[in-house]
A protein has these predicted regions:
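Short, basic/glycine-rich phosphate-binding loops at helix/coil junctions
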Residues: 68-71
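N-terminal beta-strand motif that seeds the catalytic metal site of vicinal oxygen chelate
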Residues: 1-17, 31, 73-78, 129-131
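Core segments of cupin and vicinal oxygen chelate
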Residues: 9-58
């Protein structure tokens, strides 16, 4: 047995704003959005992030999600092919309305920056030579 795809499920307060943000970054929707869900494909490795309305997400969790304004849930790392590409992603994220919580910086042999989406979910772009 093996898994074929991994999905992450997060809450969104505004599906249309989520669509605008991730579309502006160049990610493709995974199917058509509904009134409770929009889904995006990340990278070429079958990683999907579903963004559910807060009410639907709470139902799925059987509990309360974290408050992303004051708490952290996870940081998704997205790979880049070069330091220059990191800088291009930085400008794209800013233009799309993302909030930079960690300015570009060297990390060991790599180069990275961190941002939040409109709902406060944290991501970073990372260049790591040989990765």
């Amino acid at each position: 047995m093996k898994t074929r795809i991994i999905w992450a499920n997060l809450a969104t307060n505004d599906i249309q704003k989520t669509i605008q943000f991730y579309t502006a970054l160049g990610f493709k929707q995974n199917g058509k959005e509904t009134s409770e869900l929009v889904s995006f494909a990340f990278a070429d490795s079958n990683f999907i992030i579903n963004f559910f309305t807060a009410k639907r997400f709470e139902w799925a969790l059987k509990g309360k999600p974290v408050n992303t304004e004051t708490e952290n849930e996870i940081i998704f790392s997205l790979s880049a092919d070069s330091r220059e590409e990191i800088d291009l992603w930085l400008e794209k994220v800013k233009k799309a309305g993302g909030v930079i919580f960690s300015e570009p910086e060297d990390f060991e042999v790599g180069y990275t920056f961190g941002f939040t989406d409109p709902d406060g979910h944290k991501f970073n772009f990372l260049y790591w030579p040989g990765m």
